[in-house]
């Protein structure tokens, strides 16, 4: 385990690749990243806040909140109004992705963080329970024959 010990003070560590090769390559990769950010990512809406969010109206930004115009909830829609309600929905892939991520953040805020952070032990036991339950669900078909023969030894 000598490789695990820290080196003595003032030890000069030599890079694996000579600096004459490593520095120009890393500089080129850095410049390509800057070029990609300036020419491609900067012209998109990736990573920006929702356009409909207004700090003065809504307060601090929340990922799990929908900042669009409020509409009737699906369970409150009458059958006659269903086609009109569906026509008002945005059906682009980005809208589906945004809705999915909003729900991910909402669940994260409700159960794993939020104003009162959960006890670490509670979160660990939640994951243990989820893992155990999923394993039981996947492997339960193995015990069907045993259940049939339980009273017939």
Curated annotation (Swiss-Prot):
One of its GO terms (biological process) is proton transmembrane transport. One of its GO terms (cellular component) is mitochondrial membrane. It is found in: Mitochondrion membrane. Pfam families: WRW. The keyword Membrane applies. The keyword Mitochondrion applies. Keywords: ATP synthesis, CF(0), Hydrogen ion transport, Ion transport, Membrane, Mitochondrion, Transport. PANTHER family: ATP SYNTHASE F CHAIN, MITOCHONDRIAL-RELATED, ATP SYNTHASE SUBUNIT F, MITOCHONDRIAL-RELATED. Belongs to the ATPase F chain family. Subunit of the F-type ATPase which has 2 components, CF(1) - the catalytic core - and CF(0) - the membrane proton channel. Mitochondrial membrane ATP synthase (F(1)F(0) ATP synthase or Complex V) produces ATP from ADP in the presence of a proton gradient across the membrane which is generated by electron transport complexes of the respiratory chain. F-type ATPases consist of two structural domains, F(1) - containing the extramembraneous catalytic core and F(0) - containing the membrane proton channel, linked together by a central stalk and a peripheral stalk. During catalysis, ATP synthesis in the catalytic domain of F(1) is coupled via a rotary mechanism of the central stalk subunits to proton translocation. This is Putative ATP synthase subunit f, mitochondrial.
């Amino acid at each position: 385990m000598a490789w695990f010990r820290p080196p003595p003070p003032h030890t000069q560590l030599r890079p694996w690749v000579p600096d004459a090769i490593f520095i120009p390559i890393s500089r080129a990769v850095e410049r390509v990243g800057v070029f990609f950010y300036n020419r491609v990512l900067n012209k998109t809406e990736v990573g920006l806040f929702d356009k409909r969010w207004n700090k003065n109206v809504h307060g601090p930004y929340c990922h799990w909140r929908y900042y669009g115009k409020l509409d009737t909830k699906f369970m409150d829609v009458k059958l006659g109004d269903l086609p009109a309600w569906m026509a008002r929905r945005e059906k682009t892939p980005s809208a589906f992705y945004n809705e999915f991520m909003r729900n991910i953040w909402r669940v994260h805020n409700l159960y794993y963080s939020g104003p009162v952070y959960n006890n670490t032990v509670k979160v660990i036991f939640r994951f243990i329970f989820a893992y155990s339950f999923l394993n039981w669900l996947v492997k339960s078909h193995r015990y069907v024959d045993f259940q049939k023969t339980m009273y017939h030894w």
